[in-house]
Swiss-Prot record:
Keywords: ATP-binding, Ligase, Metal-binding, Nucleotide-binding, Queuosine biosynthesis, Zinc. GO terms for biological process: queuosine biosynthetic process. It comes from the Bacteria. Its cofactor is Zn(2+). It comes from Chlorobium phaeobacteroides (strain DSM 266 / SMG 266 / 2430). Catalyzes the ATP-dependent conversion of 7-carboxy-7-deazaguanine (CDG) to 7-cyano-7-deazaguanine (preQ(0)). This is 7-cyano-7-deazaguanine synthase.
Amino acid sequence: MKAVVLLSGGMDSLVTTAIANAQGFELAAMHVNYGQRTWHKELEAFRLIADHYAIGERLEINADYLAQIGGSSLTDYSMPISGADLQGLSIPTSYVPFRNAGFLSMAVSWAEVIGAERIFIGAVEEDSSGYPDCRKVFYDAFNAVIALGTKPETSIAIMTPLIEMQKSEIVRKGMELTAPFELSWSCYKSEGKACGVCDSCALRLRAFERAGMRDPIDYEQRPDYI
């Protein structure tokens, strides 16, 4: 069975790809550039990870309309990337409004064309930034939309294998599957060394700390988040 993997190049999408690969799916990898600050590094990570898993069927999409819409510090350079607040309950400025719905729509379109029956996305509801489009209920609803909006003979379902996992569990799962974490990129701010202090870096570093392992990528700072 063929599956589309939404592969940003980050830690979660890497482990999701490793899981789909281990389950024996024929993988097709999709990457979206949406005008984010670190798009060069994320695209590089996507290509390296796709090479690692020998994924030949790939789609790189330009969706910079999200940068034109704005509203996120990832795409609007007038908004600073805020430092990590792992105890806060508010949605951080890095949230890109309704981004995942757009990504999923593109993935469903491609899946329908190439005959893929599954779409894997590395969304995490637990132990994450609290983005509303990373909740299980959102993906359950989107599966209903797919059933209504595709051809009757189409059978496409979204798979979210990480949705209820803690970040440290994701690290351990990746290690179990020998996922190449050194090829992935999570930093929202930098394309040289990861900053170590943005929300995404903090969640990643804390996950590795809790898993009792050292993150293999380079950081400008490595604060202790435990």
